[in-house]
Amino acid sequence: MSITTLYYLLLKKENAHEDSIWCCGWSNIKPEKKKQVENEEINEISQDSNPEEEQSESYIITGGLDDIIKVWQLNNGKLEVKHQLEGHSLGVISVAISPDGKTLASSSQDSSLILWDIATGEKLKTMETGATDVWTLDFSPDGKNVISGSNAGKILIFSVESGKQEQTLDTRGKFTLSVAYSPDGKYIASGALDGIVKIFDVVQGKLVHTLEGHAKPIRSLCFSPDSQLLLTASDDGHMKLYDVVHANLAGTLSGHASWVLSIAFSPDGKRFVSGSSDRTVRVWDLDTMQCQHVFKEHNDQVWGVKFNSESNKIVSVSEDKSINIYDCPL
């Protein structure tokens, strides 16, 4: 029996928001390590402590056109709201989660960018974006910066600590719809309204590659966990894989019948997932570049997809206001 036959819809949450859900994330907060205790006897007791106390906290984050962000926990097969975050006055466009899983960044149609504590639901700070439209977000791998695309074709780099804009990378192009930071911290990639992809060297702050493989808007892009590949998704219905260092096209993936709105790699780097306006979620194998499975459980376009930290589950969100969680065994 093929492992793909074991893929199934684990949970569906209808009407999770009052309007379309545009973005999602999956946070994994690891427990704080206990300080080393000098007394050996006490140390032995701490080592024998209940392992359940050491388990990570897993949260699903969703942002909607209803201006609301929700932090969910999966308990006993049910999705339960832990926090409802209110601070944006218009629809939530993008959410990004810091590498340690503790901090959430959110952007909105109201041009605001807000940082939140995921575990407590507390608003940490509102970034100083000025009058610039902020769009898709990503964290730097060290968690010190948040990057955003903008309507002016620029990539904005904000300091998490100060809340201020530290740097701007000019793509000299159209509206920057999507941005991604490479996991090794060396590159930032952007996708534009005209289908052009730019790759910048972070240290030098300069453009190193321009990729012109798509003819329509790039709504999502992401780096592979080893930072060697860049995956792009476009309204032309295709996805493309590029070798980051040499900017060579490694492959074109087709299968969606309409716009590809969201893509994400699995943390183990073996698979990636795509969501489309054709209402499907597709799981792809990186080695073969073949589609492993197609989920057809949404009734409208799929705006967001993400893997969990174990790479064995996927969350998707849609215009149909629902959240789907799929079991995708390794």
Segments (PLM) and residue ranges:
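WD40-repeat beta-propellers
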Residues: 69-73, 113-116, 155-158, 197-200, ...
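WD40/WD-repeat beta-propeller blade N-cap
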Residues: 14-21, 85-92, 128-134, 170-176, ...
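Blade-level signature of beta-propeller repeat domains, shared across WD40, Kelch, NHL, RCC1
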Residues: 303-330
